[in-house]
């Protein structure tokens, strides 16, 4: 089943739906005890969900070899569509060997629950170092994305998938808004232009500034924090969501913003992941996407505006979503407001640069981020969470 409501077309033209019908689900359940089974990790589980709900349209499953190779090499699927991140299911030789192409495979979540089915069309080996270098720009195992590639299995399992059923998110059910629902929500609000914002950090003042700048020129903001797998030192999703709720309640016009969770896992692939994040938001119905400083970056692996420059490699019609590029915002002590070099006459010493990394470092030291960094209610929530975490 492929469908979408009015508005911007999903990537590839159709919104993919790989959630099993009641009849399909019963068929899978009847055969469950006779199917070979594999246990998915947190990232593979979230990838299965994103494929099933259409967030990764046009993908209907995990990539076959030909698509995998063109994505790694050229950031395109074999049909020419732009796709910058390989979405694969990697397992060990021991797990892959007994599996036969053409058969169904039962997919279990990390707790062992039966959640999906893979129609195994291919199993193939791949070059981990080559994937790391092309996708992440480095073979350094200290890079969290590269580390995942090196530690995962040596064989990719490919083929279409089905999600047994769409369950409510255990922590954030009210913010679980799938692409078909976000598109309907935009339509009901009469929004024709919607800007998406990706984040794995609590909203600090620089984020708030660029979101509101974008909101000045579009109908609505789709605030879409990622709640899938992240680095261990990233601030936990439940803490971040409470911060977003505070911001929504006190600092944003609620009729112009929709807050929803993004169940994806972070890859930390910098420029390539920026393209990926934009295409995912296009599937959710966004017409624009905010690309800020070092989007989806980690450490010093990528240049400050390398992710923004990546968008210039593609024709606008190939992406089908408009990147809104913002310079590094800072708090200007001369004008006492948020600004960038485009709007502030300040000297370097009059600029307080903000980042999620700086906020995390202050919290670890037990310091309350100043109002130039973070809204006071958000700062209080963060410091309270860190104190409770230490107990």
From Swiss-Prot:
One Pfam family in the UniProt entry: PUA_2
Enzymatic class: transferase
Catalytic activities: sulfate + ATP + H(+) = adenosine 5'-phosphosulfate + diphosphate
Top-rank taxon: Bacteria
Metabolic or biological pathway: Sulfur metabolism; hydrogen sulfide biosynthesis; sulfite from sulfate: step 1/3
CDD domains registered for this protein in UniProt: ATPS
GO molecular function: ATP binding; sulfate adenylyltransferase (ATP) activity
EC number assigned by the record: 2.7.7.4
Protein's GO biological process: hydrogen sulfide biosynthetic process; sulfate assimilation
Keywords annotated in UniProt: ATP-binding, Nucleotide-binding, Nucleotidyltransferase, Transferase
Family recorded in the similarity comment: Belongs to the sulfate adenylyltransferase family.
Protein name in UniProt: Sulfate adenylyltransferase
Organism: Rippkaea orientalis (strain PCC 8801 / RF-1)
Lineage: Bacteria, Bacillati, Cyanobacteriota, Cyanophyceae, Oscillatoriophycideae
